[in-house]
């Protein structure tokens, strides 16, 4: 929303898309898709196409190159306003709160239900700790 081309979501009038802001937003969000351990295993501090650090603003590290690619490829196929609405919906979603509202209903007498709770240790949006809380409540 700080991209000057966003224009409070009215960017279609001038046919100029807020690509910089959308690209940076995607790069930041993409970091949350991998845990710190996963990022370290995948990239560490490996250099991208060079033997020494340039101390410039080009992508010295593989992780920089990867995130820039993710950001740029995203603006080619996604709309900034759509991304804002999707990320806002994710902000408001609370898996555990939804679970608590439904747990009493799902534990009616004589009901034989099986549950499968799957989590990924690399998931920052829905951490494994939250899944463990749900499993404990189901037991």
Name every feature range the model reports, one short phrase each.
Residues 1-73:
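Alpha/beta-hydrolase-fold enzymes
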Residues 111, 117-119:
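Short beta-strand/loop motif that positions the catalytic acidic residue
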Residues 105-112, 138-139:
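Short, conserved loop/helix-junction motifs that constitute active-site signature segments
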Residues 45, 98-103, 127-137:
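Short alpha-helix in the alpha/beta-hydrolase fold that links the catalytic acid
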Residues 73, 121-126:
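Acidic catalytic loop of the alpha/beta-hydrolase fold
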Residues 72-81:
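Helix-enriched interaction subdomains in cytosolic or periplasmic regions
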Residues 69-70, 84-107:
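Active-site nucleophile elbow and catalytic-triad environment of alpha/beta-hydrolase enzymes
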Residues 92-94, 124-128:
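Flexible loop/turn segments at secondary-structure boundaries
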């Amino acid at each position: 929303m700080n991209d000057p081309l966003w224009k409070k979501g009215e960017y279609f009038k001038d046919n100029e898309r807020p690509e910089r802001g959308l690209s940076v937003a995607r790069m930041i969000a993409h970091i949350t898709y991998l845990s710190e351990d996963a990022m370290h295993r995948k990239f560490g501090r490996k250099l991208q196409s060079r033997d020494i650090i340039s101390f410039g603003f080009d992508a010295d590290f593989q992780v920089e190159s990867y995130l820039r690619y993710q950001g740029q490829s995203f603006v080619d196929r996604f709309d900034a306003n759509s991304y804002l609405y999707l990320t806002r919906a994710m902000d408001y979603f609370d898996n555990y709160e939804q679970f608590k509202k439904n747990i009493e209903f799902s534990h009616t007498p004589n009901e034989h239900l099986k549950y499968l709770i799957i989590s990924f240790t690399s998931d920052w949006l829905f951490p494994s700790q939250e899944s463990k809380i749900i499993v404990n409540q189901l037991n």
